[in-house]
């Protein structure tokens, strides 16, 4: 009997705080970051098929690799190796429906890898716990463990070492998507170049951010948003300055480049304010698409029969 296809929904992330240290011996940078999972999601389905491989649909699908470099396919291989299976016998097919921006600094590829791990764990009836899956996830990519966990978390090391963080509030965001993506390695390289030439400002300590999250006050949190990669992203994409300025002028409490960019995230006081900011920002001509999101939300989770009841995140095309 052929197993029933398994579908997993997995969220995007935004970095509320991202402190980038110097380059380590392994080539990675030491990070201190605060992740929050947002209500922008991909859906990943795995099933047994005669032809193994990956298919991608949704916004930006043409830019997503479908070969061995795809993180979801790396997840298939990694899990197969861990449990001694051959993913080609019988074949595993991965179908990705994109709702998270591609190359946008919101960990869409990592999210797909996390979803593939969880889905295959059920398809193959491996009964691995989340901690064991998280260990495999960390070997695939720095952001993959958080996509599994979701919520709000403090990340250290490469970002893969996670501690859950208390957030007493639903935080409301407006997400501005740029017309073109940025590749994460290039942004880190640009930050290294900027630091060699000058001493760009670095974000402060993380403890005040954790206190603001515990307080549940978006105004307090807005004062503390910070991202060491923002200077590099803006250097590579100068138009982001205009986007960040436009979001604040539209009424957001604060704006930040999400991760390595170029997506910009704007924190708002409440849901109504987010809708107003999104409407004004969409008419400013500074980005391709505007979406409204909230967080924190859970990490990767199985999709059951609630699909018809699931709200679609609002978006406006500029």
Curated annotation (Swiss-Prot):
Top EC class, one word: transferase
The record lists its disulfide bonds as none
Its pathway is: Isoprenoid biosynthesis; isopentenyl diphosphate biosynthesis via DXP pathway; isopentenyl diphosphate from 1-deoxy-D-xylulose 5-phosphate: step 3/6
Task: Please give the Gene Ontology molecular function terms for this protein.
Answer: 4-(cytidine 5'-diphospho)-2-C-methyl-D-erythritol kinase activity; ATP binding
Keyword field = ATP-binding, Isoprene biosynthesis, Kinase, Nucleotide-binding, Transferase
Which reaction is the catalytic activity of this chain?
4-CDP-2-C-methyl-D-erythritol + ATP = 4-CDP-2-C-methyl-D-erythritol 2-phosphate + ADP + H(+)
Q: Does the keyword ATP-binding apply?
A: yes
What this protein is reported to do is described as: Catalyzes the phosphorylation of the position 2 hydroxy group of 4-diphosphocytidyl-2C-methyl-D-erythritol.
Q: What is this protein called?
A: 4-diphosphocytidyl-2-C-methyl-D-erythritol kinase
């Amino acid at each position: 009997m052929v197993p029933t296809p398994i579908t997993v929904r997995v969220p995007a992330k935004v970095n509320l705080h991202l402190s980038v240290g110097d380059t380590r011996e392994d080539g990675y940078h030491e990070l201190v970051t605060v992740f929050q999972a947002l209500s922008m999601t991909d859906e990943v389905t795995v099933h047994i098929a005669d032809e193994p491989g990956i298919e991608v649909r949704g916004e930006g699908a043409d830019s997503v690799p479908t070969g061995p470099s795809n993180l979801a396919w790396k997840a298939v291989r990694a899990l197969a190796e861990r449990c001694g299976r051959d993913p080609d016998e019988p074949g595993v097919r991965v179908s990705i429906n994109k709702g998270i921006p591609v190359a946008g600094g919101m960990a869409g590829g990592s999210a797909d890898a996390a979803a593939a791990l969880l889905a295959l764990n059920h398809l193959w009836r491996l009964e691995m716990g989340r901690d064991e899956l998280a260990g495999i996830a960390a070997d695939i990519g720095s952001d993959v463990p958080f996509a599994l966990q979701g919520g709000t978390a403090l990340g250290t090391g490469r970002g893969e070492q996670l501690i859950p963080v208390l957030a007493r509030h639903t935080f409301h965001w407006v997400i501005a998507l740029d017309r073109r993506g940025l590749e994460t390695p290039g942004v880190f390289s640009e930050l290294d170049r900027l630091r060699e030439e000058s001493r760009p400002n670095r974000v402060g300590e993380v403890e005040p951010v954790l206190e603001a999250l515990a307080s549940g006050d978006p105004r307090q949190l807005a004062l503390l948003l910070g991202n060491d990669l923002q200077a590099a992203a803006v250097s590579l994409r100068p138009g982001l300055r205009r986007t960040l300025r436009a979001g604040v002028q539209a009424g957001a409490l604060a704006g930040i480049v999400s991760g390595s960019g170029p997506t910009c995230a704007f924190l708002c006081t409440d849901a109504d304010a987010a809708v107003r900011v999104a409407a004004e920002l969409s008419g400013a001509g500074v980005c391709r698409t505007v979406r409204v999101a909230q967080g924190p939300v859970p990490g990767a989770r199985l999709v059951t029969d609630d699909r018809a009841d699931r709200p679609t995140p609002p978006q406006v095309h500029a």
